[in-house]
Structure formats: C-alpha cells, structure tokens
C-alpha cells in the first residue's frame, strides 16, 4: 500500500502537515524487501505530525503550534501506530529466548544477612519506588529556560568528537556497516600500543569484509584540553587554565578513548584510588554529553523558529541518553554524588531523600580482607533504579524515567522492569535512545547475576512500542533504521577482566568507533604465588580440549577431575582428611556433588551460597573435626562471606579463581592450620586444574610469562613451591 493511500484512509493525516515544509524525510527499506532487490522508500508519515510548543522543557521534544491537547494526543497515537507498522516490517522482532530459571540465577538467600542486612527499605517498598519511575509524571515542565548563555553554546566544530561521531558520519557508511553486521560480514582489525612498561592497549575497529581498510592507532593526547568541554564544566572543575595538568596517570590513559566515544573495557588496580579517578572522568564525559545534546536541541529550536522549512535531526525516540549500571546503592550514591558535584548546578531536588535511601556509614568487620571491606561497605542493597533529569537550573532526582537524562540502576532493579513476570508492567522503551552506557564494578556484578547484564543489552536501542512525545521530524535516521547500536558507547570498568567481560565488549557492542581494551603484564613477583609467602607444593594440571570448543570445555574439565583428581583423593598418599575442593561455578558444583554422592564412597560435605546458616555451621564444624574427609566450597559463598575454613590440609581448585585474592586466601587456610600445628606444609599440597581458556585467571595467579608457558608448552603438569 502506498503512503498516499494510507493518508487517504486515515483522516488524522489530513490538514496535518507542517506549514512551509518543502521536503519530506524518507524511511529506507532494506534491499531484501522487494523481489527485484531494489530499495523502496516511504514518505515518513511522522513528518506530518506537529507538536505543541514546549521550549521550556529540555528534552527530545520540539516546539510547534498550539492546538487542542486531547485531539493532538489522539492523532499522535494513531500516527505512531502507523509508523510502527512500517518500522516493524523493516525490523522483525527476534523470538524471545526461553529462559530457564535455576538455582544459579537466584540471589543467595543467606549471603551477608548476618553482617549486611538492610532493614531500612523492604523489597516491596523498593519495587514500588521503581514502578513509580514509570508512571506518568505531570510535574511542571516550565522549569528550564530555553535560553542559554551564548558563551556556552557549542560552535559545532567538526573536530569535536560529539559532532564527528553522532552528526557527521555519512549515511551510506552507516547503512553498509549495519548490513554487514546483519549478514555477519564484519571483521575487526586491531592495533596494539604501549601505555607503560607493564601495560598495553588493543584497539579494534569493525570493517566490512572485502574492503581495504587501514586501522590506525587512535589519536593520543592524554589531555582533557584536546576535547570540547562545555564552559560550565570548565568553570566548575577548574579546567580554564591550560597550563595546569589536572589528569592523573590513569585518567591520561582513558581520556582519549573515552572522549572519542570508543567502547572501553578497562581493568584497574586500586579499589579506592582508581575507582575514584575513572569515575571523575566518566562523570565529566557524561555531563558533557548531556549538556551538548540539550544545547543542540535548543539551538535548533531557535533555527526552526527563524526558518520552519529547515530540517534538523537531533533527537532519539525517548529522552534518556545515559545508562549507568552499578552493583549496590553505595556505589550508586558515590556515582550520583560525583555527577552532582561536577555538574555546576547548585539546586538538587530530592537530594535528602536520595541520601537517606542510598547513603550508609556502616562498615564490615575489620577482620575481613580490605577488598571485602571496600565492596561491602555502606548500603549493599542491590535493588534500585533512579532517574536524573537536568534542567538549566536544577537536577531532579527520582524523575520519571521517560523524562530523565541519566538512569542509574542495579542489574536486578532494571531486570524487574525489563522482564517483569507481570507482562503488563514490562517496559523497555526508555532504553531506546541510550547513547552512553557505563558498567561500573563488573567484577562485583558477576557475583550477583551476570545474566541480568546480558538481558539489559537485549533491550537496548530497540524501536519503542509506544510513542513518548517524540517529534518525528527531528529523530535521527539511524534511530529510525534501528542502527543506534553502531553509535552507542559502552564503557566497562572492572578489577579483573573475565571471559564474561570480554563477551560483553566483543559480542554485545557494535560501536563503529571501535573498542579499546587495556592489558596488564603481571610479573611473577606480583602474582598470587609470588605474594603467598608460603612454601607449599602448588601443582597445576592442564587438560586439553579437542577442537578448542568453549561449549564442551566444562565436560572435558569434569572428565579430567573424575578420572585423575578423584582417584588421587581415594588413594591419597598424603592426608586422608582436610581436603577442600574450591569450585568457582555453581553448575559445576552441582555436577560434582551429584557425582560424589552417586559414584564414590568418599565421606564429604558441602557449603554453598544457598546453604542455610545451620548447614554452614554444622558442615564447617564436622570438617574441622576431621569427620568429613572432603569439603566442597563455592566461590560465590567465599565472595559474600570470606569464611576462614578451619581444618584444611590440602586444596583442589576445580578452576582458577577469577579473583587472584581468593587463591591466596584459600591457600592460607593451610598455612593457618599449620601454624596451629595441625598439618605439615611438606605434606600438604595445592592442586589447580586449568585449560588454555583459563589464561586470564592463570596469569594473575602465576604471572604473565609463566601463564604463557603453562598454556602452550608440551608439559601438562607444573609445580611451584
């Protein structure tokens, strides 16, 4: 059906054209839509929509003529339905994967309840708070003066990465790259560079297979002054004097890929210092992006008033542009507080409520490791979503999500909206126009439920199901053509890079600007073994995977464990009890526990993240007394509790821990037992099973050079002492 016939059948289109508009925008159909392979175009029905004047609202809503609001809303709903019919024919919805809920996807029932229980806000109150963020918000929108200080208006310099990334990319290039991703005809070309003697980076950029494309090392200035910051941010953050150098060594590494809108996967060193420094930088970047987006809209509002016939594409489907995912309310408090302090805005609505619900001065026991004290300090509640709306004079916390510029959430909190069991409450339209995404402290999130992060990516940058006051005449074409993923910048910060982190940045990000990752060279003296301080036999067993199949790796590991390690335990020439088997993955734990129950006569017990407190106490006591020969111990329980397991004489690591601190903490169980005179270090052993796929964890435990030898040499058994 032609577009003209659609208009004839729908009276809502009649007499509804923007006055003075000469040209209509086009929506491209994919070439596969016609038998002849030609490209069809349809007049953008949304071009004919007018909108009521709303200059005071700084959002993705444009100004227009005044008319009856109820009539306008009815027309817009019908027009949007027509537009969705066209768009969904271009971009069919993939079938939803059936998600199987098992124990590994549940939150640990008992974890931290004795030390970090948050009784201030119950789960019901938290859920209502989140749902309120989706309700219609009829607050006064005349709170943002559409005028802006002329000194702080951007010059739209083509050298500004904000302009070159979002506004200067040829449409033909975007279409070709988008089609290449769909047909899996994309490859990444990479270059390596040095950051220091012990750190390097890898920059990779997507190119269409068959095209001659030279990928050069990204421009490095290591200076914040190389980028176009808003004047308000310069004044607020002391960046007016270019003779000063405000950046730390860490920030100099990150400033270029960050402000060039490249995807980032960054592995940092220090919990306290490094986290504070990279948050300073990304808070500045986020604010700069929000301010530039707002000012561009305001400037184009003025241009349209001067010349209504011009076309200005500067908006997405919905207002939110930044999504920040953090593990706990404590981290959310620190991030939001950082954003407020750097914003240059004094008025913050509902700041007291936010501090009451997110700030907590409680500290974990000092007997726990320092890393534990850092991760679990303050408010450890992991169920929240909060919106931040920026006007010229104020920041509004707890704003309606569709009226927010920034959304700060936990994986569990936003999961409740995206995958709500009540289908009527499911929504993801507010994620349709995200241009910057930050995942902070991924290493902590991985112990909550990493699948929630992948769920978020499934819902990003989709075409909305409903209209949300968007001016279709100003929506960028790459939003309409469902190409926003090519423009979205994703930044992931973690203490330890893991396979899951690599999977996110490599498999779920399509940024046309490429991705930037750092890699740290770990000397043997800085490895876990080098810092253990114990002279104990540490034996590493490698098993090979036929065909290097990642999918079959768990089966090969289990086969090696049951055919080599279990017989060794049964016929042990060392201690007959006190054997601790450390298992990082819960599914592996279930498999091993079932095997030992059904196939062996070994007297064993187990403690895991789902054990009741009674089971935890009973099995730990029996193991310490030697009445249990073997104890199965999960990594997730260790992360949340950091128990001191007594009675340990030997350790078997079913897989190298991703966190190298855990390796030393578990090995020291033997050392503490030896100090009490209950074991002999000359008889005790530590065994670790690994494959080539464990390279990331292995190099943190034995060092980078040793890990390469262990992974690729002919020998399959290596011993350290």
From Swiss-Prot:
InterPro entries: P-loop_NTPase, UTP25, UTP25_C, UTP25_NTPase-like. Its main location: nucleus. The keyword Transferase does not apply. Pfam families: Utp25_C (PF06862), UTP25_NTPase-like (PF22916). One of its GO terms (cellular component) is nucleolus. The keyword Amino-acid biosynthesis does not apply. It is found in: Nucleus, Nucleolus. GO terms for biological process: maturation of SSU-rRNA from tricistronic rRNA transcript (SSU-rRNA, 5.8S rRNA, LSU-rRNA). GO terms for molecular function: rRNA binding; U3 snoRNA binding. Keywords: Nucleus, Phosphoprotein, Ribonucleoprotein, Ribosome biogenesis, rRNA processing. Interacts with snoRNA U3. Interacts with MPP10, RRp9, UTP8 and UTP18. Component of the ribosomal small subunit (SSU) processome composed of at least 40 protein subunits and snoRNA U3. DEAD-box RNA helicase-like protein required for pre-18S rRNA processing, specifically at sites A0, A1, and A2. Belongs to the UTP25 family. This is U3 small nucleolar RNA-associated protein 25.
């Amino acid at each position: 059906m032609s577009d003209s016939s659609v208009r004839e059948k729908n009276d809502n289109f009649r007499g509804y054209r923007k006055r003075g508009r000469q040209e209509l925008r086009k929506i491209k159909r994919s070439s596969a839509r016609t038998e002849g392979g030609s490209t069809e175009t349809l007049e953008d029905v949304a071009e004919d929509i007018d909108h009521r004047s709303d200059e005071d609202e700084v959002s993705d809503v444009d100004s227009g003529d005044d008319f009856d609001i109820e009539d306008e809303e009815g027309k817009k709903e019908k027009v949007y339905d027509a537009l969705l019919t066209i768009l969904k024919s271009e971009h069919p919805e993939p079938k939803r994967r059936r998600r199987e809920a098992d124990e590994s996807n549940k939150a640990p029932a008992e974890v931290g309840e004795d030390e970090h229980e948050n009784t201030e806000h119950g789960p019901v109150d938290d859920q209502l708070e989140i749902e309120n963020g989706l309700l219609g918000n009829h607050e006064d929108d005349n709170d943002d003066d559409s005028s802006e200080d002329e000194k702080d208006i951007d010059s739209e310099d083509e050298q500004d990465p904000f302009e070159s990334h979002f506004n200067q990319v040829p449409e033909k290039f975007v279409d070709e790259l988008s089609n290449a991703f769909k047909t899996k005809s994309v490859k990444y070309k990479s270059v390596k560079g040095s950051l220091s003697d012990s750190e390097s980076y890898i920059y990779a950029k997507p190119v269409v297979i068959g095209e001659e494309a030279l990928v050069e090392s990204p421009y490095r200035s290591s200076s914040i002054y190389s980028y176009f910051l808003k004047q308000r941010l310069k004044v607020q953050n002391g960046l007016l004097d270019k003779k000063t150098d405000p950046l730390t060594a860490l920030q100099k590494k990150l400033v270029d890929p960050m402000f060039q809108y490249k995807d980032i996967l960054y592995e940092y060193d220090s919990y306290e210092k490094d986290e504070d420094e990279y948050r300073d930088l990304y808070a500045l970047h986020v604010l700069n992006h929000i301010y530039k987006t707002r000012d561009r809209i305001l400037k184009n509002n003025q241009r349209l008033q001067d010349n209504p016939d011009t076309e200005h594409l500067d908006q997405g489907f919905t207002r939110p542009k930044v999504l920040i995912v953090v593990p706990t309310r404590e981290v959310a408090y620190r991030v939001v507080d950082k954003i407020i302090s750097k914003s240059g805005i004094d008025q913050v609505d509902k700041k007291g409520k936010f501090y009451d619900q997110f700030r907590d001065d409680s500290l974990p026991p000092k007997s726990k490791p320092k890393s534990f004290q850092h991760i679990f300090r303050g408010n450890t509640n992991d169920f929240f979503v909060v919106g931040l709306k920026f006007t010229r004079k104020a920041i509004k916390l707890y704003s309606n999500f569709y009226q927010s510029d920034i959304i700060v959430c936990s994986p569990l909190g936003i999961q409740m909206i995206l995958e709500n069991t009540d289908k009527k409450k499911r929504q993801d339209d507010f994620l349709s126009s995200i241009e910057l995404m930050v995942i902070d402290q991924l290493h902590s999130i991985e112990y909550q439920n990493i699948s929630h992060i992948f769920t978020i990516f499934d819902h990003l940058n989709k075409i909305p199901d409903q209209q949300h006051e968007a001016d279709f005449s100003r929506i960028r074409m790459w939003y309409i053509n469902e190409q926003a993923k090519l423009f979205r910048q994703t930044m992931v910060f973690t203490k330890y890079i893991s396979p899951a982190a690599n999977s996110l940045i490599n498999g779920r990000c399509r940024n046309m600007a490429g991705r930037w990752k750092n890699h740290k060279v770990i000397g043997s003296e800085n490895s876990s073994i080098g810092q253990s301080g114990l002279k104990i036999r540490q034996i590493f067993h490698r098993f090979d995977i036929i065909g290097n199949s990642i999918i079959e790796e768990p089966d090969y590991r289990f086969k090696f464990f049951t055919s080599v390690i279990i017989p060794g335990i049964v016929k042990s020439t060392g201690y007959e009890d006190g054997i601790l088997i450390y298992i990082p993955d819960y599914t592996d734990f279930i498999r091993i526990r079932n095997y030992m129950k059904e196939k062996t006569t070994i007297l064993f017990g187990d403690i895991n993240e789902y054990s009741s407190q009674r089971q935890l106490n009973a099995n730990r006591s029996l193991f310490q007394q030697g009445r249990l020969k073997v104890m199965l111990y999960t990594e997730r329980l260790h992360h949340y509790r950091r128990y001191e397991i007594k009675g340990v004489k030997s350790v078997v690591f079913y897989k190298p821990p991703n966190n190298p601190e855990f390796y030393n903490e578990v090995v020291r169980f033997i050392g503490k037992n030896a100090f009490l005179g209950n074991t002999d270090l000359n008889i005790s052993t530590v065994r670790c099973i690994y494959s080539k796929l464990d390279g990331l964890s292995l190099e943190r435990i034995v060092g980078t050079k040793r890990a390469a030898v262990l992974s690729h040499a002919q020998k399959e058994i290596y011993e350290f002492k």
